[in-house]
């Protein structure tokens, strides 16, 4: 068909805006990979160690890169500034200086609230390759998940069969737990005050549980996770580890904590977990759920988009999902809980307290 005969009903301005929108999403991965590169090169750490803004020439001396690629590095910094990971300032000699933003402070390696390990896990080829199988997954029944199509095994089998990847993932989850625990014990401590015993289901190496017992010294915590996850971890009088299966049995306690657990499963499996939790706490107890509630805090910058990204990731990895409040209500009610309380406490995520 001749171009002049195509009726697209768009003005020139609309046409070019539409093209820019497509291109923006076509190359959105460039932001992700530039972020990954910044962490791998240690740019945030170098700036932080310097303790004040650095010029491009200072950065180039401090960062172990091929000096013939200095101009390319400047372009990387320009992209990262545009993504709000760094800011530009003018120095006395008019050379541009770079400094940290709140977001890049979360990328400092070894910092208490760093999210750098999580970024590196999510952007590792093991976890990015499944996205290339999305259309095939929709069309065929060969694989239960996109992850399985890409890797030849399930997500959990991959972590169990490759210990280095398992440790990589555990550290990513630990860094997330430290940030969540910081907010929970600082701003929502009343949620855990008065609890004598708590089981952190899927609590990994106990990062979250350790922070909780430090904040509430009268509490005793138990971490329940798969045997290979808790193997070798030492219990104390306040914190113990149990290797087990949450689908089979959950130890009794005043409260059960589910942080980023239910979203890994479809409704059928999620319902089984919640029923086990309800039985474990009994009347007078509660289940504390920290997870995404799609649409909550949607008016906060980037939150809804993050929630939808997480939803697509859960579909890719597990054929699971993030849930709206209506979907959460149905699941909580079906599990036999009589009431719940929702608190939009964690930005992209929310706090749900479910009562038998």
Swiss-Prot record:
<feature type="binding site">
    <location>
        <position position="259"/>
    </location>
    <ligand>
        <name>S-adenosyl-L-methionine</name>
    </ligand>
</feature>
<keyword id="KW-0808">Transferase</keyword>
<comment type="pathway">
    <text>Aromatic compound metabolism; phenylpropanoid biosynthesis.</text>
</comment>
<dbReference type="InterPro" id="IPR036388">
    <property type="entry name" value="WH-like_DNA-bd_sf"/>
</dbReference>
<dbReference type="GO" id="GO:0032259">
    <property type="term" value="P:methylation"/>
</dbReference>
<dbReference type="InterPro" id="IPR029063">
    <property type="entry name" value="SAM-dependent_MTases_sf"/>
</dbReference>
<comment type="similarity">
    <text>Belongs to the class I-like SAM-binding methyltransferase superfamily. Cation-independent O-methyltransferase family. COMT subfamily.</text>
</comment>
<dbReference type="GO" id="GO:0050630">
    <property type="term" value="F:(iso)eugenol O-methyltransferase activity"/>
</dbReference>
<dbReference type="InterPro" id="IPR036390">
    <property type="entry name" value="WH_DNA-bd_sf"/>
</dbReference>
<feature type="active site" description="Proton acceptor">
    <location>
        <position position="263"/>
    </location>
</feature>
<dbReference type="InterPro" id="IPR012967">
    <property type="entry name" value="Plant_O-MeTrfase_dimerisation"/>
</dbReference>
<dbReference type="Pfam" id="PF08100">
    <property type="entry name" value="Dimerisation"/>
</dbReference>
<feature type="binding site">
    <location>
        <position position="225"/>
    </location>
    <ligand>
        <name>S-adenosyl-L-methionine</name>
    </ligand>
</feature>
<dbReference type="GO" id="GO:0009699">
    <property type="term" value="P:phenylpropanoid biosynthetic process"/>
</dbReference>
<comment type="function">
    <text>Phenylpropene O-methyltransferase that catalyzes the methylation of the para-4-hydroxyl of chavicol to methylchavicol. Can also convert eugenol to methyleugenol but with less affinity.</text>
</comment>
<feature type="binding site">
    <location>
        <position position="202"/>
    </location>
    <ligand>
        <name>S-adenosyl-L-methionine</name>
    </ligand>
</feature>
<dbReference type="GO" id="GO:0046983">
    <property type="term" value="F:protein dimerization activity"/>
</dbReference>
<keyword id="KW-0949">S-adenosyl-L-methionine</keyword>
<protein>
    <recommendedName>
        <fullName>Chavicol O-methyltransferase</fullName>
        <ecNumber>2.1.1.146</ecNumber>
    </recommendedName>
</protein>
<comment type="subunit">
    <text>Homodimer.</text>
</comment>
<feature type="binding site">
    <location>
        <position position="245"/>
    </location>
    <ligand>
        <name>S-adenosyl-L-methionine</name>
    </ligand>
</feature>
<dbReference type="InterPro" id="IPR016461">
    <property type="entry name" value="COMT-like"/>
</dbReference>
<feature type="binding site">
    <location>
        <position position="246"/>
    </location>
    <ligand>
        <name>S-adenosyl-L-methionine</name>
    </ligand>
</feature>
<dbReference type="InterPro" id="IPR001077">
    <property type="entry name" value="O_MeTrfase_dom"/>
</dbReference>
<keyword id="KW-0489">Methyltransferase</keyword>
<dbReference type="Pfam" id="PF00891">
    <property type="entry name" value="Methyltransf_2"/>
</dbReference>
